[in-house]
């Protein structure tokens, strides 16, 4: 049990996919200007990342490895991710049309989010079992969501702040992201 808790904590805080591995930067910078859309993107990404991680493990274990098709791993994982994203988009469109409009192009772009594919491939490379794959996917999603929501809240405050003209917009966003990354480096010694 403690092994799973350590995996979760290390994935969320120590090895955060956005701030440490630099995966998922497109939605991190693109959807983080408003807190409402960041929360919606976080929920959608959490669902997609967790489910894609589980399904990718199953595809790898029960289709690719038994039939010696490991050379199709990346392509099959992208296909799994695309199916999960389409399912998620249909659910979001049916349940919350306003959230679907707010997320706009970023919801279908979860398919090309390198963090989602990165989690699936790292599960294979690190030889995680089924439960570890699910926890790793969920932890990566929680870490992504945590960083996205915190960054979005900071960007909303910065929009109202008196920022010097050369630093307005993307420049102050990059500085803020760098400072967040430094703050998360403080968790480095937490888990080995």
From Swiss-Prot:
GO terms for biological process: electron transport chain. The keyword Transferase does not apply. It is found in: Cell inner membrane. Pfam families: Rnf-Nqr. Its EC number is 7.-.-.-. It is a multi-pass membrane protein. InterPro entries: Ion_transpt_RnfA/RsxA (IPR011293), NqrDE/RnfAE (IPR003667), NqrDE/RnfAE_oxidrdctase (IPR050133). It comes from the Bacteria. Keywords: Cell inner membrane, Cell membrane, Electron transport, Membrane, Translocase, Transmembrane, Transmembrane helix, Transport. Its main location: membrane. The keyword Chloroplast does not apply. The chain crosses the membrane at residues 5-25, 39-59, 65-85, 102-122, 134-154, 171-191. GO terms for cellular component: plasma membrane. The complex is composed of six subunits: RnfA, RnfB, RnfC, RnfD, RnfE and RnfG. NCBIfam families: PRK05151.1, rnfA. Part of a membrane-bound complex that couples electron transfer with translocation of ions across the membrane. Belongs to the NqrDE/RnfAE family. This is Ion-translocating oxidoreductase complex subunit A. The lineage of its organism: Bacteria, Pseudomonadati, Pseudomonadota, Gammaproteobacteria, Alteromonadales.
């Amino acid at each position: 049990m403690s092994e799973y808790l350590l995996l979760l904590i290390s994935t969320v805080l120590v090895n955060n996919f956005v701030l440490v591995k630099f995966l998922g930067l497109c939605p991190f910078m693109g959807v983080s200007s408003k807190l409402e859309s960041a929360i919606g993107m976080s929920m959608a990404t959490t669902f997609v990342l967790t489910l894609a991680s589980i399904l990718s493990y199953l595809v790898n274990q029960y289709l690719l490895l038994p039939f010696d098709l490991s050379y199709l791993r990346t392509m099959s994982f992208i296909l799994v991710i695309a199916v999960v994203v389409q399912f998620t988009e249909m659910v979001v469109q049916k349940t919350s049309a306003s959230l679907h409009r707010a997320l706009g192009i970023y919801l279908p772009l979860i398919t090309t989010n390198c963090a989602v594919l990165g989690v699936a491939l790292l599960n294979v490379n690190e030889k995680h079992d089924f439960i570890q794959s699910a926890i790793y996917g969920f932890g990566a999603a929680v870490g992504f969501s945590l960083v996205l929501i915190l960054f979005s809240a900071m960007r909303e405050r910065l929009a109202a702040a008196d920022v010097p003209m050369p630093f307005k917009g993307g420049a102050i966003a990059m500085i803020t992201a760098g400072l967040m990354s430094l703050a998360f480096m403080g968790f480095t010694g937490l888990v080995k």
